Amino acid sequence: MLAVFCFCLCSTAFSQTKEVNIEAGKLSEQITEEEQTTLTSLKITGKINGSDIQLLRKMAGKAYETNVKTNGKLSSLDLSQAQIVKGGNNYYVLKSGTSPKYYQPTEDNVIASYMFTGLTTLTTLKLPTNITKIEKFAFAGCSNLTECTIPESVTTIGDNAFAQCSKLKTIAIPSAVTSLGVAAFKGCEAVTNVTFAQGIQLGKIGKEVFSNNSSLTTITLPQSVTEIGDRAFYENYSLTSITFPSGLTSIGVSAFETCPELTTLPKFPSSLENIEDKAFLNTSVTAFTVSSANDYYTSEDGILYDIDKVSLVLYPAGRVSETLNIPETVSSIAKYAFAYAKNLKSIELPSGLTNINDSAFVFSKLTSVTTLASNLAIAKYAFSNCLNLTTVDFKGAIASIGDYAFQNDRKLSTVKFVGTSIPDFGKYVFTPKAVELKIHVPSGYVDKYKEKIEKKPAVLGSKYQVLGDITDGVLNPSFDGNVFETARYNVDGTKVTTRTKGLNIIKLSDGSVIKTFEK
């Protein structure tokens, strides 16, 4: 009886693994009906075409049609000594509307589109060593695949080729690769190591290539790379370190957005020409530094400016300081420049500032904002979702405030306008809910402000008041004998040394700012 039991075990083991040598289209002749659902390991030598791929998909849990499951259990597939050739039956059909699209190999030595997509039973896969291209969605959704070595002969990896291979642990890009498609490795959550072969001539890390990864901590980009595409490393939750190539010219939109552990960056190289919106949004970077030879950007105290310091481009969200005085040369604050600033509590905006762009301070931890600027234009969502913001003091005339500029600022209770020229308000600039908003305006201008506010409407709901209690540009001024003047500006924001006729903006030694009207 023991002998019979041992024989059964051996038979079962034999039925679960197999090695075959075949001609193209002949795999079905060497795999029995029973083996199609019991084999867990298979090695193929010889040539295979679309007909063979169709059977392999069935053995690995997926039928010819999209998302149709089978009872196949194949987990290990070795094609290292096989060759994929064109021809044979369709191995996959993608049903989209009334026009299904069929796929079969049309070239030799190519992992064609959708060839192994969705094979959730596969854990290891060895590819033919002579493969030259891996096309779109070739392995997408192989959610249990832990090991797949890309052959040295591969030159192109297509869009979403390995997307959602959520258990893949390492990615090694061969030296022959010159193109990585959109989202090629998107959602490979378990990848801890990405390497590029020495001598690789890859010029661009494409859009979303390594996005949505929760395990990768560090990456060194090859020297050949000049562009980092949009969302290339978006939502890399564990990324702490990256090395930029010396010839890098551009960093795309949201390239490193929501990389919360990214605190330090290498110096931006002299070649860098363009950093797009949200490139480092919602990171913890503490300082930006730039090569002194860069012609486009410069930095001061870890803050990134354009080369002339006319535009403030990026404020490091992880910077520890709670206050900031922006240089007088700055006339524009870029989109998302201060977004998610974690520690900044108060800011004084300079007199020469003319533009605060979209979402410039969104989700920052500001509690107060003071601006000395006249004719300032504030774009939509500029200060939205500043959940701790309580006070905004416009000490110069405001030209316009865009839609939802202070949306969802739940604690905002005080806004002061000294300008007698009423701003052009956008829709729902303010959205008071829990706290009543008090809008202070110059004496005698309550009705004019109310008219403009109500016309849009600029305030959502009725939980606000417009109060005409600012006289000569000063709200209830009071002076302490120990406080003295440290600086004075005229109505245009120009620094002056003596009293000038008209509105004077005065900075005091206690840090406060008042306004007086000199006749």
For each feature predicted by the language model, list its residue ranges.
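Consensus positions within tandem repeat domains that build extended binding/scaffold surfaces
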Residues: 113-115, 135-138, 158-161, 181-186, ...
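Terminal processing/anchoring signals of secreted or surface-associated proteins
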Residues: 42, 304, 449, 473-477, ...
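Extracellular/surface-exposed low-complexity segments
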Residues: 436-472
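Structural signature of tandem-repeat unit edges
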Residues: 17-22, 40-48, 66-91, 96-110, ...
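Residue-level detector of functionally pivotal "anchor" positions at catalytic/ligand-binding pockets or at interdomain
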Residues: 468-495
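Boundary/junction segments of secreted and surface-exposed precursor proteins
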Residues: 12-31
